[in-house]
A protein has these predicted regions:
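Hydrophobic h-region of N-terminal signal peptides that target proteins for export
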Residues: 9-18
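Mid-domain, small-residue-enriched loop/turn segments at the edges of structured enzyme/sensor domains
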Residues: 38, 131-190
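Soluble periplasmic/extracytoplasmic beta-strand elements of cell-envelope proteins
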Residues: 40-44, 69, 90, 132
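Acidic helix-start/capping segments at beta-turn-to-alpha-helix junctions
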Residues: 85-102, 137-138, 164
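Conserved catalytic neighborhood of penicillin-recognizing serine enzymes
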Residues: 96-132, 140
Length: 193
């Protein structure tokens, strides 16, 4: 009798999960129709496995999504001792590009620290700060090398800001998921050993 109860509970749990997945997919498809857009979603567990997703294999324009892994690369360099967070990055008016609020604010002093630039790039999506960081790591090609180093064979960076808003460069939700998982989970689990 316990076995039958266990089977019933498992069946109920499975049908509830399947129903939630159907609702998730249906809701996303409805949102795509309403917004006349395609949406990619990857929900990941702590082991890096996708537990739910929509358009996970489709490529999407990177736009500003590369700023988070760029900051992660900068923090890796700080952690390894090849970079200092308080190091001043000098720049002039030529570094001011479309949407550079923090870079404009620091222009009078002529510099931002590495950490200030990373914070501005991620929190404000500051294009000037992003270009400062790209300059310091060796340019877009160095960012692509970082993608390869962490196992992302799809994503690439060919330009600086604001040209990254051009939708011709792409990554997939799967690759972005792997990238974020590497940065957020893998590093913390490695540090524990």
């Amino acid at each position: 009798m316990r076995f039958i109860h266990a089977l019933l509970l498992a069946g109920i749990a499975h049908s509830a999960y399947a129903s939630e997945k159907l609702t998730f997919k249906t809701d996303l498809e409805k949102l795509e129709r309403e917004k006349a857009a395609q949406i990619g979603v990857a929900i990941v567990d702590p082991q890096g496995e996708i537990v739910a997703g929509h358009r996970t294999a489709q490529r999407f324009a990177m736009c500003s999504t590369f700023k988070f892994p760029l900051a992660a690369l900068v923090f890796e360099r700080i952690d390894s001792g090849t970079e200092r967070g308080d190091r001043k990055l000098s720049y002039g008016p030529d570094m001011i590009v479309e949407w550079s609020p923090a870079t404009e604010r620091f222009l009078a002093s002529g510099h931002m620290t590495v950490l200030e630039a990373a914070q501005a790039a991620v929190q404000l999506s500051d294009n000037g700060a992003t270009n400062l960081l790209l300059r310091e790591i060796g340019g877009p090609a160095a960012m692509t090398q970082y993608f390869r180093k962490i196992g992302d064979s799809v994503s690439r960076l060919d330009r600086k800001e604001p040209e990254m808003s051009d939708n011709t460069l792409a990554t997939s939700e799967i690759q972005l998921r792997l990238l974020l998982w590497h940065v957020l989970w893998l590093k913390s689990s490695m540090a524990a050993h």
